[in-house]
Amino acid sequence: GLVFSLLYLADLMWFICAVISTFVGAAISVFVDKLKVFRQNSEAATNTVHQASSADSLWQPDNLTNYARQVFERFQYDWSNLDYESIHKYTTQRYSNHIGLVMQALRQMGRRNVVDNVRINEAIFADAHDDANNQSDRVSVAFLAEADDRLEEVATGKKIRSANEEFAEKWNFVREGNEWKLDGINQPTEDVSTLIGSLNKFAEDNGMYFSLDWGRLLLPKGGNLFLPRYFNSADVNNHVIGVWDGGILVQLYTCVLKNGNGFTDEGKNKDEVNYLIGQIMLPKSYGGILVDRDDNSIFRKRVIAPFGYKKVKMEWGDFNKRYTIFATNEDQAASFELLNPSFMAWLYDQDIKANIEVMDNIAILYARVSSDEKRYAEML
């Protein structure tokens, strides 16, 4: 129930605070290309497929390409309808689990990602490995395609974002018996220099799922951090999703916000600001709450509360000196689990340079991280 879920909430945010406190940032760059990046190994992959087909009919090139096309088109339909049961039939257990969590997050956020009018312009073999005993056979097919892609609110049909443009993706299949199962999808914009190994390892160690390159699919919209001008330019990487104790869905990711949303330490305007963000789904809506930490820097960009927010004073005077709280409803802010005295005391003692923001039933804890550091501590 609600009370049971809230008991886990403070522990979860303590964990996210601890994670953020151990990290410094990394430079994030985007390599924009389409199918070209996947052509680099295409000739070798095609040769592998043809050679394997001479002794194994499952590798027959035309059949393999046609099957990959069918999965590509079927997945778009099932994804648009949040049909996990159908997707589970042609994906590996690992990948279907990952997709299931993403679908769960979409439902909790009241969203759906509709991809229709799909048109495949080209399909090529991008990678292939023919194992001697068939246990590790794998093949990747890269697609150049077009589609009407829109993220929308389920209740109202309101578009959050939309696109209709050519795109490239690499679809990875692994062999299970006499079947090929979809095991993942790669984007051409993936850049290994943005990889944070400790986040990837944390996902592996805790039964969570990691994606190097991630879009704005599950990004909150509104509040202070994700105003429309920042949301539309956000670049999300190192995305981790999983279930924490108590069944609470948690995400961790790095995010670059553009359009000058921040200042350098010298007080100069900055075109890009890097954040490490922890995000959880709350068991109910708390309206809008913003907990802003004052780091006493004269160069720091002060938070201006969104329209409709009012400043809220807590009973603890020292806390008010370090943190400023804004909320759309003072009573809802007072009932918010993370603003109870024990958590506020812990947050104060840790002295973590991070803010907390609540947008309805989504809570995020975020901290600015340096763009020129390359070292990351391991997850706690």
Per-region residue spans from a language model:
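Charged, low-complexity intrinsically disordered regions
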Residues: 183-380
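Hydrophobic/aromatic beta-strand elements that line small-molecule binding cavities or substrate pockets
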Residues: 122-128, 168-173, 254
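A short, structured loop/turn motif at beta-sheet edges
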Residues: 127-139, 174-179, 281-286, 330-331, ...
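Core segments of small alpha/beta cavity-forming domains
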Residues: 44-117, 197, 201
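Hydrophobic structural segments characteristic of membrane proteins
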Residues: 102-150, 157
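Short, solvent-exposed beta-strand/turn "edge" segments of beta-rich domains on protein surfaces
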Residues: 64-66, 132-133, 160, 265-271
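Juxtamembrane and targeting peptides
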Residues: 1-70, 153, 186-189
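Exposed beta-sheet edge and beta->alpha loop/turn motif
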Residues: 1-14, 132-192
